[in-house]
Amino acid sequence: MLCRTVMAVSAMLLLATPLQAKDCPVQEFGLEAREDAIRNAPTCRQALEIMQACAYGASGDTGLGAAVRERCEPDFLPKLSKAQKRAYDREQKRCDQKYARQSGTMYRSFTAFCQAQSAAAHAARFGATAKAR
């Protein structure tokens, strides 16, 4: 049984194609420059892509995630009903709670990504470009 599991995992790893990591478009190494690039992104989706490319994988990502939410939320928050806004807030809190009991800066990064991805998904669903489709 263990042998089959090891073989199956090995086969999946061999068949998986590695994803090409995007380079961070921000030439400066500072956190503020990365946050500014996210805030000034033309679209919410591009803001999330910049976060993904420029992420630290540690607690520094909390600032990047906040910048994504600052960029994305104006696209959809005014259009949400009260019930939809409560659902969005619950989703954001769920992201906080998901890794709250875990220690380590990596888990703060996971929380930041969860919240940023939630904001980007809501912007795609309820934002101005969503109605144009």
Regions found by a protein language model. Give the residues of each.
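Positively charged n-region of N-terminal signal peptides that target proteins for export
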Residues: 1-5
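Bacterial N-terminal signal peptides
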Residues: 6-16
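Sec/Tat signal peptide C-region and signal peptidase I cleavage site
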Residues: 17-21
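Mitochondrial intermembrane space
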Residues: 22-133
